[in-house]
């Protein structure tokens, strides 16, 4: 709550030389660092170095938070100052890619054995139209990440992103053999979406698909705790789900 009201945002806003390093989009409760500014990207990379140097970590992982809005006002002034010869959308894609690259380089500058990965939205199109995350570039070129773990939190019959087709799309994008694909699975949906509620064992089936596929290096569950702390515990349903997952792994 401090960061929402009087924290990071106010610290930057009080300094005239940081006019738009932190922005708060209209209707948003949060302050957001502006990735269009090189100083902001450096600040984030420095934070990663601090973690890697001072803590015994195996990796650095970031979630699907990139641009919080499509509104031009968020970084319009920086775009004007940049005199970019590309569209605002393409410029934002470049900003996020520069940020991701700087994090990767920061990690490797400390210890090349520390891995860096990202868990972007599973809906590929949303990454481009809403988040300005150039996931295809990161999956194809070296120097951005070691693994990608898209949030493929969809059932097989999802109207927009059915699981099998979405997984296949991600597999086609990961063309760099040095980058591992880890499939994110939405355990939290077991009591939130009809397909998961009406059909036992969907997560277990998805695990089997991923492990038998040959193009994925593994899977991640979001959130693992959901198997034990969430939802209606009557009827033994969650016990059946956990047993099905266990069976899929053995």
Feature annotation, model-predicted:
Residues 1-12:
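Single conserved hydrophobic/aromatic residue that forms the stacking wall/gate
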Residues 6, 100-112, 168-177:
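Surface-exposed amphipathic alpha-helices with a cationic face
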Residues 9-10, 72-74, 231-234:
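Short aromatic-enriched loop/helix-cap "lid" or pocket-rim segments at secondary-structure transitions
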Residues 13-141, 153-154:
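Polysaccharide-binding and catalytic clefts of secreted carbohydrate-active enzymes
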Residues 101, 122-139, 160-174, 202-206:
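Alpha-helical scaffolding within the catalytic cores
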Residues 142-160, 170, 177-250:
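Substrate-binding cleft of secreted/luminal carbohydrate-active enzymes
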């Amino acid at each position: 709550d401090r960061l929402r009201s009087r924290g990071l945002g106010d610290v930057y806003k009080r300094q005239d030389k940081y006019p738009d390093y932190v922005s708060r989009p209209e209707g948003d409760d949060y302050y957001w660092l502006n990735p269009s500014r090189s100083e902001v990207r450096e600040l984030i990379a420095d934070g990663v170095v601090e973690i890697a140097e001072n803590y015994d970590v195996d990796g650095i992982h970031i979630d699907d938070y990139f641009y919080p809005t499509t509104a031009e006002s968020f970084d319009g002034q920086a775009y004007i100052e940049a005199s970019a010869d590309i569209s605002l959308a393409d410029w934002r894609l470049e900003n996020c890619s520069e940020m991701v690259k700087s994090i990767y380089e920061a990690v490797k500058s400390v210890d090349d054995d520390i891995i860096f990965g990202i868990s972007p939205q599973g809906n590929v199109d949303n990454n481009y139209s809403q988040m300005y995350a150039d996931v295809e570039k990161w999956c194809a070129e070296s120097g951005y990440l070691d693994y990608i773990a898209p949030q493929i939190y969809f059932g097989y019959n999802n109207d927009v992103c059915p699981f099998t087709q979405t997984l296949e799309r991600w597999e086609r994008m990961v063309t760099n053999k040095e980058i591992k694909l880890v499939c994110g699975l939405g355990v939290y949906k077991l009591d939130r979406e009809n397909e998961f509620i009406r059909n036992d064992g969907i997560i277990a089936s998805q695990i089997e698909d991923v492990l038998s596929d040959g193009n994925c290096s593994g899977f991640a569950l979001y959130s693992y705790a959901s198997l034990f702390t969430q939802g209606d515990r009557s009827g033994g349903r969650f016990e059946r789900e956990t047993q099905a997952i266990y069976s899929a792994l053995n």
